[in-house]
Regions:
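Sec-exported extracytoplasmic/periplasmic mature domains
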Residues: 19, 39-40, 46, 51-68, ...
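Ligand/substrate-recognition segments at binding pockets and active sites
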Residues: 107-169
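A bilobed periplasmic-binding-protein/Venus flytrap-type ligand-binding module shared by bacterial periplasmic
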Residues: 27-49, 53, 62, 74, ...
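Beta->alpha turn/N-cap motifs
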Residues: 4-10, 56, 75, 160
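Conserved hydrophobic/aromatic pocket- or pore-lining residues that grip, position, or stack substrates
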Residues: 1, 50, 101, 126
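Short, hydrophobic alpha-helical packing/hinge segments within bilobed ligand-binding/sensory domains
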Residues: 10-11, 46-47, 59, 97, ...
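Structural transition elements
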Residues: 70-109, 130-137
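Extracellular/periplasmic solute-recognition and catalytic clefts
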Residues: 1-38, 61-62
């Protein structure tokens, strides 16, 4: 018998069990979030802050059970193009994220914990599909990290087939 593509959250069921032999190989598969470059995320400082506020290392360790390598370039670590020598300008750094948002003019003027500018709250939709069990959990982690810097992250589950259409529009 054989199983492939075991969900990250389920791999622990098979570890340390003499009944199972697990072979792991590096994959070209990625877990990514596409960032809209319109609206509030049209500002490069807000985009950089959004990326800097996300603790991708913790997401991998806790949600994905250490089965992925956090990205820092559009090149997967399984390709030998010097991935280990690359730097990550948007590594997890809450203070940097807050500073970038300050520089972009987003402040919490009403004390509700969410930054605002010109009377509008800093709110971002995080669109996910539910066919992969880890995505809602991942989105909730991003939402919690958003609160740390004053971004209201709204989770919007949609059918998988709508994701690409949303990117086109």
């Amino acid at each position: 018998d054989m199983a492939v593509n075991i969900a990250a959250g389920d791999i622990g069921l098979f570890n340390d069990n003499a009944k199972y032999h697990i072979d792991r190989i590096a994959s070209l598969r990625t877990v990514l979030a596409r960032i809209n470059t319109k609206g509030v995320l049209g500002d490069p400082k807000v985009r950089a802050a959004f990326i800097s506020m996300t603790d991708r290392k913790a997401y991998n360790e806790v949600i994905l059970k250490g089965t992925f390598i956090p990205g820092k370039a559009p090149v997967p670590p399984s390709l030998d193009y010097g991935f280990d020598q690359l730097t990550d300008p948007n590594a997890y750094n809450v203070d940097r994220a807050k500073q970038l948002l300050d520089e972009a003019g987003w402040k919490d003027t009403d004390g509700d914990g969410i930054r605002d500018k010109d009377g509008k709250p800093l709110s971002v939709d995080f669109v996910i599909y539910n066919s992969r069990a880890e995505l809602p959990i991942y989105a909730e982690a991003v939402q919690a990290d958003g609160k740390k810097v004053g971004i209201d992250v709204k989770i919007k589950p949609v059918d998988y087939n709508l994701i690409d259409k949303m990117g086109i529009n």
